[in-house]
Design a protein with these regions (language model features):
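Gly/Ser/Thr-rich phosphate-binding loop
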Residues: 236-244, 253-326
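ANL superfamily adenylate-forming
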Residues: 108-149, 256, 319-320
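AMP-binding/adenylate-forming catalytic core of the ANL superfamily
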Residues: 65, 86, 103, 356-364, ...
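Conserved pre-ATP/AMP-binding loop-to-beta segment of ANL
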Residues: 139-157, 164, 187-193
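Conserved AMP-binding/adenylate-forming core of the ANL superfamily
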Residues: 16-62, 66, 70, 87-92, ...
């Protein structure tokens, strides 16, 4: 297997097959990589040789971003993917923490830099005449270095769902490793077209999208994700493969279904964090196979599904993946299920997903030894994700380590409750999280987004919960907020910390309440003991 991005790209330098499709234009691999080589040569020529050659990208999902990625690979310097949804001092902080000496942006994002202190950072607008002149004047590419597999290719910031984003050092070897695996798994060839609509500054797009195209020679169709525009794009570009992360499938399924939705070229959708129901429904509606797994930006834990995967499970882990009690640093016993399928031993079975073999491919967080140390303890990698595993090794997610709820003296996690709520047909998206209980501990709160044209009454919701034999009475949401949308990261991951901080102070939608020991829901403020 090819060991670096640099080697992968060099193999395609003379390839006349299509590489990039965007709008009405098509670039061959030869054209795409020739442009990338000039791009890299220009940046290396103007770089400060006394500083790390870190090039930031504040760019959208466009050919310019693909060129910047290829240029970094060919040129042997480090690319820093800057989150385009960050603003103000948070944005400046990311650029600074990544030690960017050069920042590439475009007309769509240039204004985000206005007023920011970016001293020591040279900014180029790739849509400007200045950049065209700099790039055109570049000579032949002499790489900054010939990279080794373990060298850093990109700094990619985590999504920030549970705290401030951290810059993960992504090694060159991770890209060909991921790409070769997915190419083999899904039989991707140069005749395929990879639809890249997830943010290219994020690991999902890099590992589950870009890597697939590089490893197979397939064409890439970069796009900004649009639920209503997805089908038209698939048909326009002849896209046969797409990657996703977070809730895009739910957004697409919320759009009205057409009689010919399955008339499209899509063959495979691969990603993570989709709801079980959405996986099946997307596959049915669009005539494609959906493979959903588990992964993280750090790349230290890999869990994959196969055809035998039971409902609710994300799959089995690679060797070394286990569930550990983080306090005792011992492996948790297998999950035990009662007669109706409910987890009977949550306090013992739920633990943190770890890699007992160590860091795996995780290269640490750039310039953040403390955060790296929190992940690497006792010779193992601790993921921060809660889960339990059955006797056959199938893993079921339970939430993040910060999502434990203490309800009436019982420990609960959020993911199992969310999986049950997803069974209710009107619900399109759901988030379960903790809010303070007026007496002691936590109260369960659920935020719901309904499907297009769907309706839900307090009576219907309560009746549904009562009919779920595997839902503990203590797991019934005390508060239910029905809203039009939920706060998400740039990668469509729900920001539960924002929801928890908001609590009951909602300014839109409908808020329901249930008495502490009752089963009936009513509008908040209209029933007895709303805070009891």
């Amino acid at each position: 297997m090819t060991g670096t991005v640099q080697q992968l790209l060099q193999m395609r330098i003379d390839d006349p097959a299509p590489a990039v499709k965007y709008g009405d234009r098509v670039w061959t691999w030869r054209e795409h990589l020739d442009e990338a080589a000039h791009h890299a040569a220009a940046l290396i020529a103007v770089a400060d040789v006394d500083r790390p050659l870190h090039v930031g990208t504040l760019l959208g999902n466009t050919p310019a971003m693909l060129t910047a990625m290829a240029a970094a690979g060919l040129g042997g310097y480090v690319l820093c993917g800057i989150n385009t949804t960050r603003r103000g001092e948070a944005l400046a902080g990311d650029i600074g923490r990544a030690d960017c000496q050069i920042l590439l942006t475009d007309q769509a994002h240039r204004g985000l830099l206005d007023g920011l202190d970016l001293s020591g950072v040279r900014v180029f607008d790739v849509d400007s005449a200045q950049w065209a002149q700099v790039s055109a004047g570049a000579g032949e590419l002499i790489p900054h270095r010939t990279v080794e597999p373990g060298d850093t290719f990109m700094l990619i910031f985590t999504s920030g769902t549970s705290g401030e984003p951290k810059a993960v050092q992504v090694a060159h070897m991770m890209v060909p490793f991921a790409g070769a695996s997915l190419v083999q798994r899904f039989s991707i060839t140069a005749a395929d077209v990879c639809y890249l609509s997830m943010p290219l500054f994020h690991s999902n797009a890099l590992m589950a999208g870009w890597s697939v195209a590089l490893s197979s020679g397939a064409a890439m169709a970069p796009a900004t994700f649009s639920a209503s525009g997805l089908l038209d794009d698939l048909r326009r570009y002849g896209a046969t493969y797409m990657n996703y992360v977070g809730k895009p499938l739910a957004y697409v399924l919320a759009t009205p279904e057409g009689p010919d939705d399955a008339d499209n070229p899509l063959r495979v959708a691969f990603g993570n964090e989709a709801a079980e129901r959405d996986i099946a429904e997307f596959g049915r509606r669009f005539g494609a196979t959906v493979w959903d797994g588990f992964g993280s930006t750090e790349g230290a834990v890999i869990i994959t599904r196969d055809g035998q995967c039971p409902t609710g499970s994300v799959g089995r882990g690679f060797p070394g993946v286990a569930i550990y009690n983080p306090d005792t640093v011992t492996e948790c016993p297998p999950a035990v299920f009662d007669a109706v399928g409910a987890l009977a031993n949550p306090d013992e079975a739920i633990g943190e997903i770890v890699n007992t073999d160590g860091a795996g491919m995780f290269g640490g967080y750039y310039n953040d030894a403390q955060a790296t140390g929190e992940r690497l303890r006792h010779g193992m990698y601790f993921s921060g994700d809660l889960a339990y595993r059955d006797a056959d090794g199938w893993i079921y997610l339970a939430g993040r380590t910060g999502e434990w709820l203490r309800v009436d003296g019982e420990n609960l996690t959020t993911a199992p409750i969310e999986r049950i709520l997803h069974r209710l047909a009107p619900i399109n998206r759901v988030a379960v999280y903790a809010v303070p209980d007026p007496q002691v501990g936590d109260a369960v709160m659920a935020a719901l987004v309904l499907g297009d044209g769907a309706a839900l009454t307090p009576q219907d919701f309560g009746d549904f919960l009562a009919a779920q034999p595997d839902l503990s009475p203590k797991a019934w949401p005390r508060y239910v907020w029905i809203t039009d949308d939920l706060p998400v990261t740039a990668t469509n991951k729900i920001l539960k910390r924002t929801l928890s901080a908001q609590g009951l102070e909602v300014t839109s939608g409908v808020l329901w309440h249930r008495e502490a020991r009752g089963g009936r829901y009513h509008p908040f403020g209209s029933g007895p003991s709303d805070l009891a």
